[in-house]
């Protein structure tokens, strides 16, 4: 029972990380600024997992975006909806850099967020792109 509750809170934390990345991108401000503002204004306080996830995605963003551009067949980063871009950034980060998160969980969580936050087509797109990256994972240079 505790595991499902933890998964639920982790899912919410991931959604909040997407919101932080989205806000930073749309407003053109650093992720750290959005985190600081939310830390000061949010009740209950911002979750540590959320903060770490958003920060780490931001730290690896250049390489993540290169990988998305390379493996998103028929799509450029600019053509993707902003929310999808940020869901994918989290998925790629968790898939390639978060060793404590199984690949299947990283993909399933990203697909779940796409279902919750984006268009009807987004879950299939997110699943396909992250699955392609998972297959390529052994040969990717990070």
Curated annotation (Swiss-Prot):
Biological process annotations from GO: DNA-templated transcription termination; transcription antitermination
Pfam families: NusB
Superkingdom as given in the UniProt entry: Bacteria
A Gene Ontology cellular-component term: cytosol
Signal peptide range: none
Entry-linked InterPro entries: NusB-like_sf (IPR035926), NusB_fam (IPR011605), NusB_RsmB_TIM44 (IPR006027)
Keywords: RNA-binding, Transcription, Transcription antitermination, Transcription regulation
Protein name: Transcription antitermination protein NusB
């Amino acid at each position: 029972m505790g595991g499902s509750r933890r998964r639920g809170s982790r899912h919410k934390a991931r959604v909040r990380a997407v919101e932080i990345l989205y806000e930073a991108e749309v407003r053109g401000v650093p992720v750290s600024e959005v985190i600081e503002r939310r830390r000061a204004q949010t009740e209950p306080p911002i979750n540590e997992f959320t903060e770490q996830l958003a920060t780490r995605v931001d730290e690896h963003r250049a390489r993540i975006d290169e990988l998305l551009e390379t493996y998103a067949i028929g799509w450029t980063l600019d053509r993707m909806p902003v929310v999808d871009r940020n869901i994918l950034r989290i998925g790629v980060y968790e898939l390639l850099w978060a060793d404590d998160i199984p690949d299947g969980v990283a993909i399933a969580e990203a697909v779940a967020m796409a279902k919750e936050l984006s268009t009807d087509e987004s879950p299939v797109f997110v699943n396909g792109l992250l699955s392609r990256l998972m297959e390529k994972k052994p040969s990717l240079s990070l």
